Amino acid sequence: MNKNCILMVAIEDELSKHSHKTYFEHTINSWQYYCDKHNIDFYVIRSKRPDVKYSVWHKEFVFDYVGDSYEKIGVVDFDTMIKWDAPNIFDLYDDEFCGVLDNVSIQWIDKSLKAFRSSFDELSDVPMTLSQYINGGVLFFHKSHKPFFEKLKNFYLTNKDKMDNWSIPGVGKEQSILNLFLVKEGIKRKTLPYCWNTVGMVKKGMLWHNDKLDDKTTFLFKYGYIWHFTGIPIQDRNNLINDVWNNINQFYK
């Protein structure tokens, strides 16, 4: 057993309208290579827990999967791929809770926070600024955060019926709850640079290159370590991840 680990939830959800299987193995392979390179244990969760309806809520059960022995832990979404030469993320923090700011859509964040604050009394008065709001798809933390995840897990289980039948569209499922709980519990945090989670890569132009200098290197490869293919229509996402992998898979051997 190594001292650090990364967990990915890669469940083909029967409740999803689209299949993600066409790129699962590519993203998994990139993370497996990275973890082997840096002596990190890698867990892939492929099946649902009987008491959890949606795959997205399995991240809150991270310590049920990895136990108490690891010093530092990461949880990453299945639509993330890590660059072959990315440095060891676990060398970049101590005992903080780490994530990348998510400021792709201020309107979406505002709507989401309002929806969850108004739906749960315990979150109604939790303050939150845009300089605090992180993306929930790439998280790194310490073993001391187990009690925090227990609170998230218990929040879901206590409000399971409401969460499983959530009826407010366009506000996400657990990301804003994560952020509100981080503030509510006074968790010490560290904001990671954008290169560690390229959320909103299309809007930010990460798929382009510097044509003025005739530099053909895509900004994604030039400036990103963890490529997050979210915010893209599912079929386009499938095609993009497959195309990216076909162009770079030789670096993961």
Put a short name on every predicted segment.
Residues M1-E71, N246, Q250-K253:
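N-terminal anchoring/stem segment of glycosyltransferases
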Residues V52-S55, W108-K111, V199-L207:
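Short, solvent-exposed polar/charged micro-motifs at secondary-structure junctions
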